[in-house]
Amino acid sequence: MFSFFKQIFKSLKKFFFLLFGIIFVLFSIIFLETSILQLSNNLVNTYTALVQKTNSSDIVAPAIFKESSPVYKTELKEEKRHFSKIKLTEKKINFIWPYQESDFGSDSEKKDSTTKSSDNNPRKGDVNDKDKLFLARKRGILKAYGEANIAEKRIYKGLAVSFQNTYSFTGTDQESNNLNQNTVSDPQNLIYDKEGNLLGYFVDGLILDGIPLRAGIARFPGDKGKGEDKKTTKKKSEIKQASSATTVLQPLAAQAKMTDAKETTNNEEPKKDSNVEEQYTTNNKDKVWFKSDETQAGSSSGESETSKLSTSYLFTGGQEAANWFPNLYANVPIVLPISPGSQFWLETNPFKEIIEVFQKEKEEKEKQSFSLTFTLDTSKLSHLDKEEFDWLEKQAETISSGSSFGDYNLKKKINSLKSFELNINKDWLKNKVKAEKETILDSLPGFSNSDKNTIFSTQSGDAKSGTQSNPSSLIALRSSVSFKPQLQQTNVALAQQQQDKQESSADDGVKDPTFSDVQTEFDKIGTENHTPQKNLNNVYAALLHQWKSIFQEDLVKKVTALLEKYRDAFLKAKALKELEFSRQNLAIATNVSSEESASFLVSNKDSQKYNDLSIIEGINFKSWLAKEKSNPLDMVYGGKSNSEGFLEKVEYEFKPTQTDEKKKAAAKTTQGTTDSLTQLADASSSSSSSSTGDTKSTSTKFQIYPKLANILAQAQLPEASSIPDTLTNAIKQWSTLDKKGFEALDDTGKSKAANNYVALLSYFTPEFQDPNELVVTNRQKLDIPIIFKNGVNPLTLPTDQQSLVVQTPEAHGAVVSQQWLFKHDKEVLPLEGEYSWKEALENPKNLPNWLNDLPDKYKFSINGLTFAILGVGESVETGYPVLSTNSPLPNSQDEGLIFLNEQGYRSVLFAVPAASEENYYAFKSDDIKAKFPGQDPIQVVASKLKGYLNVPDSDLAFNVKDISKFQYLTTARNYFPDLVQNYLAIASVVIAAFLSILALYLTILLIKSFIKKNQTEFSIIRAGGFSTAKFIAGMSVFAGIVALASSFFGVLFAFLLERQVKGIISRYWFIALPANSFNWISFFGSMLLIFVIFQFISWIAFKQLFSKPVNVLIDQGNETKFSVFLHLLKRKSYTMTPLGKFRVSLIISRLSRLFTYVGLSSIALLLIGIAGTIPQKFGAAQSNTVLNRNFNYRLNLQTPTEQSGWYAIQPYSRFGQTDDSLGIKALYKDKGDQIQQQQQQQQQQGNDKEHPYNLKELKISDRGGNPIKHNGKEIELGNLLLPSFGGAQQLNTDENFFRHASLSKWLIDFPIRVGGANINPWEIVEKSIPKQITQLLSASSDQFLIAVLTDDYFNNLNNNGFLTRNPRTNFIQLDAARVLTQINVFNPGGVKFNEQFLKFLTKVYGDPELSYQDSKLTYGIVPVDPQIEETYTYVQGPFGFKETELNPDSPYTLTGISPDSKFVNLTDSGGNSLRSLISSDSEMNVIVNAGFQYANNTKIGDFIFIQPKNTATRYSEKFLKSPPKTPTVKFRVVGVSTDAFGQELYINQNIANRLLKLNGFDGRGVIKDVVKDGQSTDDSGGTSSGGGSCGGGSTSSTTKDKYKIEYVKPTGYVPFNGVFSKELNPSLVSKALVLNSNIGVWGNFTDFGNNFTNLVKGKENKIITSILPSDPDILKQLAKEKGENGVDSMTYENLRKKVIEKYTSEWSSTQSLASGARGIFGDNIMVPALKLDAAGASAQIIRNNAEVLFNTVNQVDGFLLGTIIPFIFITCVVLGISMLEEMKRIFISLKSIGYKDSQNLVSLLCFFIPAFVLSLLISIAILAGLLVGVQALVFGVAQVFLTNVFEFLPYMVGIVLFGATIFVIGSYFWIKLRSAELKEGF
């Protein structure tokens, strides 16, 4: 046995190469199979485990519903009953709001009052001695409504609230001589239903659930009646009041007038002013006086208590003086909210008494009324809506009682939506027509100016009197500015006086409406070919019809909102009540505020039944919201108690609500302009409040307020020891109320809870505000600060805390995907320490600072929202986070996957309004099968949802991995992981099979060779009695070495190279894979398997060997056999030499080994070809594209219209600067000293409506103060919008206010204190801006301000505090007190930036780098810097290769480039320039790129056809009844460029402009202005033209002004609609947000409603001039359609004049103009110039896809080069050497008979070289076919064209490698042959 083992080890030396070869082969097999199979198993196991762990669903139903479209049937009826205005004692319309005192709030001095309490007096509490708390609350409430400064010891009583008794339905009265407008409310506009319930306030045809009021501080006499005898009391009761209740109603500019002491005598009341006509009392019968405790009440001289008022005190008391000017500081607008039928809302309303008066003291008159009855046509509802509406009706009471304060009166709400009746008093209707004749007739179609006089002159009565001024226009009279105290006549008195005068006058020509006549006209409206009669009945009917339309629209919106609100609840209760499901919410949000990622896939992981979130690292999701310690402010800051989690607490209470901007616009009241700062504040506030009132549901109010009260009740109140016991009891009550529910209380308890709630809320915040404003969604918190939109100075709470913040810090936590975390070098928050999440939750008040201080590696942001990284997680439904069907390959560099809770998810939607949401219902088939055994779960779900979802029946429900539903991205995200698993499994099986066969073959070869080599020795040993078993045992040494070495190193390398193997699929697999340890199972398993197989093969080999006798085996030991082919070659017929025959036979004698060697060599060469060719193809595609395209982005813009004119251009760093040569006219005038003095005088009179800025003070300078020049001229910020009172007025009066203006948010987004209120100019401007634009501006504005403050120079300049940073929110904004001029309340023109800040501002914008960082909104100016940007013109429309077969949905566009373009270098494959082929402006040539040629098999000489659709005349053509057919244009393909990304077609830019009608005649250019004919605004001498000049003939006797369009054609300017940019972050995408006006009117309006009609009133001809076509061909056809003769012979100017005259007559009123414009332009008025949906589509998406593919190819390339190729080459060497060992005897024999060693070496090469050549040919053929497949695959997936041209360079590398292999084999052979002894050959 020992000798046998010795022979074994002796043989190992001879078989070293073969042994090494088999060890290496087995090592490679184990390494590859362990890596791939382990990876494949990991994929399957982790995916399966994740499905189980997260309870993942496998069936989805897209939550897509048909948009609700309720229909109302309307009928006009006659009604005898009418609820009129509120009935007021003695026609008094003033109220005092007594404090709605709670159980713990009352004025202790009230106990001593001798005044008898009435039912309306304040309620008394049980702790009247707690004055301190009550005073705090009282002061807070008063301060919220405008008190500038309140002394502790002064006594206050209440708030004066006023209605003005006018006949104005619009809420506006206007006086023609001074254009004073004052927002008011009319008691007559209160609307009641047929049962007499108050519905709301009627204004502009809408019922608002808020009543606009005027309010001010009302004060009682200091002694409150103490010591007064009855006589005195009686005498005083007869006094005509001169109090705040009157003065609060005066406009700002009117001086507060008081009675001087000299005008009074002892024991006498102040003398009456002659203008005072009425005694004003409050609803509790108390007189209202001004009174300060500092004044002497009743002196020894016997003077009255008011006689000692010092006039000097009025102006010397600093802020205290403001207390004597309530009209300045207390006359603020408020909105009285109404919630019909809601007792709770009434109880919690501070204005309860007023509401009760409105409700109880209304008048019911038996007068004729017009009744508009609206009935919901349920038969017209969709199947879903009808069933849901019926369900809501049945479940209304259950829903109301079960939703806490949800929809407290849902049943009543539904009934009012089913049937609604609006009664309109005929007197009311008449009064409206009488008071607003001009306005009404302007709004009615078909009425000309001449009709206005005709209609009223033909009626009964005096026509002349019918034209008298609106009585309400006399309400606000002004006196000259004077500091002399005197008493002015009150507005209300004037109104009443004028009304009485009017009632006593003769009929003014407006006859009473007769129901039958009006009904007849009403029924005719809308009928075909109806021509309105020019009479009053038709006016009445038209007015009623307008109201009908408005109310119908309003009711439809309310029904739609109700149905959408309860949709999920209905489906859960009805269609899906037997099924378990969860709502799946995903959103794709584009991020612009950070460079971390461009887009995020945001998943809402809040309490889902299915598809939970699995946490890999970090905080476990289930304990995400947990706290270890109890905190007094837990609920204030959204923490978690022991029993309830935050998610349950917020359920829906804190969900942000997104206001419908269209509703706001519809409900917006007319904003009047005044010359008063207070009125400016009032107008903006009233408009906002009124508009939002219509959009809020009752449920929102109930959701927020009680929850907020509960939160406040659980808060740790300051100075607890000083808080009354009753307050503590109230807190306890609210702490338990949430558990018991409001409904569990009796009526007394409800009232008590409501009152305590009001007082509690008032304790913390003085302003009882609108519920929706409580939620600051883009800051993730409920913020209850002291300062609000109309607030004043902060009220200091006992703890000096300026505000109370209710936050949800959990919403600032996010879980991210593992790939995104690694890609961006982020980390998960540590579990302990200052940066731990636990620290953030335990100290929530410091959360903003904590987030700000958090290192960047622990956080990220989306549009300004900051999120801390709590952990790494995953979920099945986002397993492959594809974001778009256009970009199916996720790119973790630019795209991220995050998981948020409900609040975080909603906040992202708010911060990214353009985010696209995907909502699904998720089901699990196993759960469905359990309830519906034997049925297909998908069909079960589909049958339940049929008729409800707005999708095809086949899409009602489907398997989540059904890739045929690829339009639903959720299928792609779920299908692709399976696809990767399957591909990897297939690859692993194929590789395993191939390698296993190869390994088995080599093992057999090794064993057979070993046995054959030692056959003689083994035969002798066998003859000595050795058994086969002992031979097998001896071979175990051989097997053990092979098994141990190959297994150990194979598993070890698999462990070490795990990350590299995973990297191959890392771009396609996003579910985290566990990190593997050394795989001992694989090690022992593979070692045992190899050992057993080795031994088994050895057993078979020895069995076969010893089947022959031993003597035979010994004799055969030295026998050398030649194949039969060698014997055949011995025939004489073959003339080959013996050596030649030997060499041929050598090749074919071992066919199996030949095939093996050729196969391995072919694979090796093929892999070399792939590794060297495919990456080179990608590199060539990229380099060719870069060579042709010298830009990173191509940005398509909206084609400018004829009406808008060409885009103006300017480098972004110069935005805001005036440049007349470019058509950018200054907003401000360069006023001389004399003019400036006149301006100042006008400002003092309050009549200046111009910007107060002078261009001289807006000249920019460098840091040294030196003026900066451009083209030799000093640069001015003449186009940067700066805040001013004149600018605010122009906003509502200038129809071209925004033309070529630039707006920087930071310069207008700050609170300006005006008249006791804070107004924010940005809030006014943003109403005319699309919401997504405002969000983008907000997201990037802070970055610029941070850059300014981090610059040392500007930070030092800011020492005076221009910019302030809020330490709590880190928000930076301007400080109005530091940047504005001293506001003179009598001089509105004084509101402007002061000189010091303007210097700071001009230096900031004088720094090019800083100026470039600022984010600006601009109107009609596109950033084009020739250094980094270039323009182009693209043409799109139906496209095809045959004129008769055009595809209207074709994705192809023609890109028109300049022949001298520096950004597009068109070259062919030979490097030759192709641009000259499209340099001609007349030849219709096109150059296509390689991608287009490949996709369409296009050849040079082919033709393409297109019908341009994005023309500049696309809206102009809509003026025509029969628009001309767009001609089809033919282009000839003249060249193919080598750029390989996407599919491109290039033409000459001038030709493109001609096709789009952007050039060609004088009527086009950059529109500088629209001016009166004969007038020019060209002050600079720049090139301008009046090609658009026109006349405006009028059909009326009054000649209207004629206007012309002033064009500028800048030198070298070429029209365009696209921009190439070299920037990686183009300013046009990230900084410059460009809006363009399709209509050519640049005013503050977003639709053609009231804003538009008010803005253009009196300017109709100018507007018509702007919006009419300018194209000659269109004008000719339009003139012919209008019946004009001689059109063909007219000049262009005359032709346009005629057309304008026609439209001036046709659109004679603002209403007809608005209607006509709406029919042409629709809602496309002010639109973003950049087509956001296609921004960079051909660059960014393709670049992302290419990057993923390139990286994957490189990973595969590295894997091939590093593992498989070396393995194959070593295997080939081993095989060669093994074959050499077998043939060694033959060659020694040949040597012995005289053949040289060189001849024998050549004989050996005759085997290897043909084998290599054959391998080379096979691999080349396979690679050629593979290249074609890869080319098609890559182009289909990523739109990247790869050439399939064969590259021989990689094969040269292969030839060298094989040469080295042959050299190694040959060297080994040569050495062996030279050292061999001849006896070895025998």
Swiss-Prot record:
It is a multi-pass membrane protein. One of its GO terms (cellular component) is plasma membrane. Residues 667-698, 1234-1245 have a biased composition (Low complexity). Belongs to the ABC-4 integral membrane protein family. It is found in: Cell membrane. This is Uncharacterized ABC transporter permease MG468 homolog. Residues 240-249 have a biased composition (Polar residues). Residues 221-239, 259-275, 284-294, 500-511 have a biased composition (Basic and acidic residues). Keywords: Cell membrane, Membrane, Transmembrane, Transmembrane helix, Transport. Residues 103-129, 220-306, 492-513, 658-698, 1233-1253, 1572-1598 are annotated as: Disordered. The keyword Transmembrane helix applies. The chain crosses the membrane at residues 16-36, 987-1007, 1037-1057, 1080-1100, 1154-1174, 1759-1779, 1807-1827, 1828-1848, 1851-1871. InterPro entries: ABC3_permease_C. Residues 1583-1594 have a biased composition (Gly residues). It comes from the Bacteria. The keyword Flavoprotein does not apply.
